């Protein structure tokens, strides 16, 4: 009779819920064997569910494949809302029908998984472009226009250039056909890939800024207006990376000028 360890090793090779191996092993009434069978079935079901989820996030891409297009770039940005730091956009062209396990809207990916999935995108993407627009430009042109500039910069770095753009809730003035998708990072794998690249890139930048400007907790809050960040603003004042067109930074700058 096979040991439970041997059965566990055998079950790892089973990829289908209908496998005859399950039928055979279910005759073994040892509780340890039954536990391993249940565990493996749950793992297979989870893989099937994940594959279906990824498949559903390729619906926009598949419509474009039918038109003969394969160089499809997903575009997304991170950092429209913070009080400090740049807005960062990424453009990513994935291979046809590429499915990266765990890839999703970056806001739905556990933080501990960010780097792993970022690396998987880096490894599998045909091309990646990153656009970074700093706080000074944001203050000059407004955050909406700055976001478009970041996206255009990211797209310009792609090689080969894309045949079509899938963009998260925005239209760009570019001579490339494009589709604007509401909640695109949750509905398109290409946009989700851009989302995680932009997120990790910006988070790393804000960690560097945390070293340059301690006291604002940038490494944790990424420039968003958390209690620690606002406390830092009150105690230490405005840094060169703060957006002076955003409140409460704007009022602090005006108050300093008037005093």
Curated annotation (Swiss-Prot):
<keyword id="KW-0479">Metal-binding</keyword>
<dbReference type="GO" id="GO:0005737">
    <property type="term" value="C:cytoplasm"/>
</dbReference>
<dbReference type="InterPro" id="IPR001352">
    <property type="entry name" value="RNase_HII/HIII"/>
</dbReference>
<keyword id="KW-0378">Hydrolase</keyword>
<comment type="similarity">
    <text>Belongs to the RNase HII family.</text>
</comment>
<protein>
    <recommendedName>
        <fullName>Ribonuclease HII</fullName>
        <ecNumber>3.1.26.4</ecNumber>
    </recommendedName>
</protein>
<feature type="binding site">
    <location>
        <position position="168"/>
    </location>
    <ligand>
        <name>a divalent metal cation</name>
    </ligand>
</feature>
<dbReference type="Pfam" id="PF01351">
    <property type="entry name" value="RNase_HII"/>
</dbReference>
<feature type="domain" description="RNase H type-2">
    <location>
        <begin position="70"/>
        <end position="258"/>
    </location>
</feature>
<dbReference type="GO" id="GO:0032299">
    <property type="term" value="C:ribonuclease H2 complex"/>
</dbReference>
<dbReference type="GO" id="GO:0004523">
    <property type="term" value="F:RNA-DNA hybrid ribonuclease activity"/>
</dbReference>
<dbReference type="InterPro" id="IPR022898">
    <property type="entry name" value="RNase_HII"/>
</dbReference>
<feature type="binding site">
    <location>
        <position position="76"/>
    </location>
    <ligand>
        <name>a divalent metal cation</name>
    </ligand>
</feature>
<keyword id="KW-0464">Manganese</keyword>
<dbReference type="InterPro" id="IPR036397">
    <property type="entry name" value="RNaseH_sf"/>
</dbReference>
<dbReference type="GO" id="GO:0043137">
    <property type="term" value="P:DNA replication, removal of RNA primer"/>
</dbReference>
<dbReference type="GO" id="GO:0006298">
    <property type="term" value="P:mismatch repair"/>
</dbReference>
<comment type="function">
    <text>Endonuclease that specifically degrades the RNA of RNA-DNA hybrids.</text>
</comment>
<dbReference type="GO" id="GO:0030145">
    <property type="term" value="F:manganese ion binding"/>
</dbReference>
<keyword id="KW-0963">Cytoplasm</keyword>
<dbReference type="InterPro" id="IPR024567">
    <property type="entry name" value="RNase_HII/HIII_dom"/>
</dbReference>
<dbReference type="GO" id="GO:0003723">
    <property type="term" value="F:RNA binding"/>
</dbReference>
<dbReference type="InterPro" id="IPR012337">
    <property type="entry name" value="RNaseH-like_sf"/>
</dbReference>
<feature type="binding site">
    <location>
        <position position="77"/>
    </location>
    <ligand>
        <name>a divalent metal cation</name>
    </ligand>
</feature>
<keyword id="KW-0255">Endonuclease</keyword>
<keyword id="KW-0540">Nuclease</keyword>
């Amino acid at each position: 009779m096979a040991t439970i360890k041997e059965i566990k090793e055998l079950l790892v090779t089973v990829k289908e819920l209908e496998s005859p191996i399950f039928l055979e092993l279910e005759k073994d009434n040892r509780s340890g064997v039954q536990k391993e069978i249940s565990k493996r079935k749950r793992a297979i079901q989870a893989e099937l569910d994940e594959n279906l989820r990824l498949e559903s996030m390729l619906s926009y891409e598949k419509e474009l494949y039918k038109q003969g297009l394969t160089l499809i770039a997903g575009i997304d940005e991170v950092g429209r809302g913070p009080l400090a730091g740049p807005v960062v956009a990424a453009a990513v062209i994935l291979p046809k029908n590429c499915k990266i396990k765990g890839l999703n809207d970056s806001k739905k990916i556990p933080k501990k998984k960010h780097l792993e999935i970022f690396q998987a995108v880096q490894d599998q993407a045909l091309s990646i472009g990153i656009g970074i627009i700093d706080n000074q430009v944001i203050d000059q042109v407004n955050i909406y226009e700055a976001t478009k500039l970041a996206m255009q910069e990211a797209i310009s770095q792609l090689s080969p250039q894309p045949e079509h753009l899938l963009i998260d809730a925005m239209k760009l003035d570019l001579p490339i056909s494009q589709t604007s998708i509401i909640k695109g990072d949750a509905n398109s794998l290409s946009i989700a890939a851009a989302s995680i690249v932009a997120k990790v890139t910006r988070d790393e930048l804000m960690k560097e800024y945390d070293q340059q400007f301690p006291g604002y907790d940038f490494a944790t809050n990424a420039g968003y207006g958390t209690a620690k960040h606002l406390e830092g603003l009150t105690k230490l004042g405005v840094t060169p990376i703060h957006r002076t067109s955003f409140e409460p930074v704007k009022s602090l700058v005006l108050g300093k000028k008037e005093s």
